[in-house]
Amino acid sequence: MKDSRGKRRCLAFLKGLRLKTDPNLPGAKQKTPFNISRFWLLVIIVIYTATSACIYFDWSAIRNLLLTVGKYKHLNVGDYPDITLSPQYKRINSLYPITLAIHFTMSVFCGFLYDHIGPKFTAIIGQMCNIMSWVFLSIDSTTVDTTFLSFVFLGLGADTAFIPILTISNLYPDASTFILTVVGAAASLSYAVPATLNFICRRYPSTPFPYICYGYIFLILVPCLLVATFLLPLMPFKGLDYYIERDQSRRSGAEGDAHRGRRGDPKMVTSQTNDEVDVEMQPFENAQSEASKGRSGNGSNTPSTRGNTPNGGKQTRGKTTSESNRSSKGEGSAIQGVEEEDQATNSSKGVNEEDSDFHRKSISLFFKVLLSYPSICIIVYFILFNISTVFYGMVTDTYFSYDRSIINIINILMPISCIPCIIFGRFINRYGSAIIIILMNAFSALMHLTALIKHRAAGLVSAFLYMCVTSIYTSQIYCFIQNSFPSVVFGKLLGFASLCGGLFSLLCEKLYDQIVSKDGASIDPTNVVLLLVIAFILMFLPLTVLYFRKYERSIEDLHQEVAMSQSSGRA
């Protein structure tokens, strides 16, 4: 009896995880370039991402490729029994934190470009940087450090080509966070690119490395550039919060008109200009009940223009809000950004006026959001997470010097990390990303501790945890930001979080110097690992607060709430 009950509960849980998307939602019907269906656009973007995203995140494979083709070999003055102690190895390893720092520093500029000039031109800039990167890598020179220049451009192009495609998630408004992790899973597949090129170099040693580089440029990067040019929109697709705000504003306006009609009062009861912005960080737990009362309680009230003028139109002077419905206890959403949009016109004058106002408002809102608790907490977490992951990638050869086969297993696991990424994405779409962030915090500590145990079983556990951590490397941050903050500042906030993570990753080079003995004969990462583990343990407290205060909205619960409110409105 108990077994059958448990089985039914398990089946009910699995059925609850089944994802259904509604193609009739307003966001799903947005116009796409060449009217391509949202499904085929997603397929093309997945291929685009899998072949040209952050390929250097599997640093072990990149390092092996550079060693195979002899980059920096001229730095070695003799033979080294342990390659990890050679100047060539150290120089190649130093490229990782530098590239990551450039990558994430560029992210903040990419975020502004995404929000203000749109995904198309941002992605074009990114792919041009990627092409330049491989052009420089194909050049073998000892007078000019072309390898360093190559990784500079690789860092510049990584997020600049990747972040713009995240706008595809807005075409799936009831599954947006899951789509973000699907794209993140495709990025995990891109980890196979350096391993594949390394295999080609080893299999066909007579093939000059520049030929391989140009083959990658013309077969992969040029088609990706064409995708960015023709299939990405000029302005980001509008998010779910835009349509919720518009619908609730209209219903609130209709209710207000009816109320005034009964009282015979032709004037507005209350109005608020678009210049007044109130940003209030509060838990999301009461947002849905507020939404059902007619207030915009979707967790990010600012219209999801993501850089475009709201609805491309002109706002009316008397924009009403439902502030009167706010309870005295301060119930609210994660971000109370009071900005709304009304009737659209096609006049270019209206668009230009709104453009000017939008940029000023968006930047002002960004700085207010930046100082909120969830923003600070998630940025601090990402800094620690980034340092941990980069350091692990730099010392894999040291961790597993007793069994090199584990490193080969890591190279295999990295591309297939797309599988746990999709699984995590499904849970994020249903339960929010905060719980997954807490899980990744635990995994990050455990992967270092198990790596210190010189045993094959512990090493395999560490490799598996590393795969899980890297599978959702930045997707966890993307999803939290999308669920918790106004989508109008998505690019800027994401870019700033990446900037902080990237700059602090430069500490990894100093940490690596600390674990090398003074005579350069041995490497012991134990002290640094213990420091990282203590930091992760301390991080559990603010992350737990973040989870229980419910700063982020559940996409699926919100969609159900919207559907109910729309049906009641029609009734």
Swiss-Prot record:
It catalyses: L-arginine(in) = L-arginine(out). Gene3D superfamilies: MFS general substrate transporter like domains (1.20.1250.20). InterPro entries: MFS_trans_sf, SLC43A_AATransporter. Glycans are attached at N35, N298, N325, N346, N386. It is found in: Membrane. It is a multi-pass membrane protein. One of its GO terms (cellular component) is membrane. The keyword Magnesium does not apply. Sodium-independent cationic amino acid transporter. Transports L-arginine, L-lysine, L-histidine and L-ornithine. Belongs to the SLC43A transporter (TC 2.A.1.44) family. This is Cationic amino acid transporter 8. It comes from Plasmodium vivax (strain Salvador I). The gene is NPT1.
